[in-house]
């Protein structure tokens, strides 16, 4: 018979896989290079940062995206259940309860803000409007045909945020990468 610790480990792995499907972790891995590219550009331009900032940027990016995806799944749960393309999402099937999604989203948002706090003051202050933009997309798509501009803006924050994490300020040189990402999505 399986031991309790074996069952607990299997449940933990199963739950992690469900949450990874909820936030489409593969898309997080696809989008992360935009933030990492900004760190490389900041390094080339002379910003002084180290492994600590790199790891905090990766953690902040992952937490912010998880919060945004969790919020979007909560907002769209009823729509997703009726849509053939999205009806099998864990949020639509009930595999994850709305309460659990809310807790996950809140924890992810808190982790993002905490990472931003430990990076620098500018990142911490900007983490709140960044979350507003990330969460705003979930409702913008219901009220405007320009929702892709909202999504483009949300995604373009990653390189700008990484630059600010590396240098402590926003520099016009990073706006080219953020702008390309914005217009590439929008």
Question: Where is each model-derived feature located?
Answer:
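Hydrophobic cores of alpha-helical transmembrane segments in multi-pass inner/ER membrane proteins
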Residues: 34, 159-162, 183-186
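Membrane-embedded alpha-helical segments that form the functional core of polytopic membrane enzymes
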Residues: 37, 41-75, 85, 109-117, ...
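Residue-level micro-sites within transmembrane alpha helices that shape
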Residues: 23-26, 52, 64, 72, ...
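Intramembrane alpha-helical segments
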Residues: 12, 17-21, 89-174
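The first (N-terminal) embedded transmembrane alpha-helix
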Residues: 24-42, 152
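Short, positively charged and aromatic/hydrophobic N-terminal segments
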Residues: 6-7
């Amino acid at each position: 018979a399986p031991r309790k610790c074996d069952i607990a480990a299997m449940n933990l792995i199963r739950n992690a896989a469900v949450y990874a499907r909820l936030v489409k972790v593969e898309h997080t891995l696809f989008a992360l290079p935009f933030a990492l590219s900004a760190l490389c550009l900041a390094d080339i331009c002379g910003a002084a940062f180290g492994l600590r900032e790199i790891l905090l940027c990766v953690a902040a990016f992952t937490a912010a995206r998880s919060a945004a995806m969790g919020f979007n799944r909560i907002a769209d749960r009823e729509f997703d259940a009726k849509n053939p393309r999205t009806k099998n999402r864990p949020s639509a099937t009930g595999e994850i309860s709305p309460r659990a999604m809310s807790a996950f989203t809140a924890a992810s948002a808190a982790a993002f803000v905490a990472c931003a706090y430990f990076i620098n003051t500018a990142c911490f202050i900007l983490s709140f409007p960044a979350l507003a933009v990330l969460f705003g997309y979930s409702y913008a798509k219901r009220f405007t045909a320009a929702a892709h501009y909202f999504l483009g803006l949300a995604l373009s924050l990653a390189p700008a945020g990484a630059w600010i994490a590396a240098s402590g300020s926003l520099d016009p040189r990073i706006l080219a990468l953020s702008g390309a990402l914005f217009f590439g999505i929008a």
